[in-house]
Design a protein with these regions (language model features):
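Catalytic machinery of carbohydrate-active enzymes
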Residues: 1-216
Length: 216
């Protein structure tokens, strides 16, 4: 079976979907699994042994489009090569118009996603052929696993795995950073893709102070 995972970004969203990738591969070891992702965050998935084909796209031309015909025109040239994989099924973990559009353009006859109430853009439901209803209150990782399980018919795994690929270059870079550290250290990540997701600098300062007081 040829399976397409549609999860374009962001970094956190990709990490939340990795357990579903692991579960699909464990349940279907002979499946051909592709993942379509935004170019800007594709490094998270490059070299991942569980992925047969990593398809990197730039969906800027789709942003802000209000009509599906406009979105299809804007992104069509980039995604025509999707059809050569002859996907049997596409699973839209994103729940947006642009992700559902990519699933549609892939040529997959079965296009699975969350039920309308679980979609971030509910009107994108029209591009899906099948949906899975999951409880709203469960963790997003388990929501994604429930979608994958419902779409492909496997039993939910007991163990949640995060198959993050690392290259030798990543290891060298991390070792160099650790070598410069003196004693124990903590890692704080103040960055974010959206202003609404950024924590105040003062709060990072308070956190750093408390870490130092407790563990310094």
């Amino acid at each position: 079976m040829r399976v397409l995972i549609v999860k374009l970004g962001s970094i956190g969203d990709i990490i939340h979907t990795l357990p579903s990738l692991a579960a699909i591969r464990r349940a279907m070891p002979d499946a051909n699994i592709s993942w379509v992702v935004e170019e800007g965050v594709a490094e998270m998935l490059r070299g991942n042994a569980l992925i047969d084909n990593l398809i990197e796209v730039d969906t800027k031309s789709m942003r802000g489009g209000m009509v599906i015909e406009e979105m299809l025109l804007g992104v069509g040239k980039q995604l025509r090569h999707l059809r050569k994989f002859k996907f049997d099924i596409a699973i839209d973990f994103q729940g947006l118009w642009k992700s559902a559009t990519i699933a549609k353009l892939s040529g997959a006859k079965r296009r699975w996603g969350f039920s309308r109430e679980g979609l971030r853009e509910p009107s994108s439901r029209v591009l899906l052929t099948d949906t899975v209803q999951v409880p709203a209150q469960i963790n997003v990782i388990r929501k994604n696993l429930a979608l994958a399980s419902g779409a492909l018919g496997f039993v939910l795994p007991d163990k949640i795995e995060f198959p993050i690929a690392t290259t030798p270059e990543h290891v060298v870079e991390a070792d160099a950073i650790i070598a410069r550290a003196v004693g124990d250290f903590a890692i704080l990540n103040p960055g974010g893709g959206w202003v609404t997701k950024l924590w105040h600098a003062e709060k990072f300062g308070v956190l750093a102070d408390r870490l130092w007081e407790s563990h310094g």
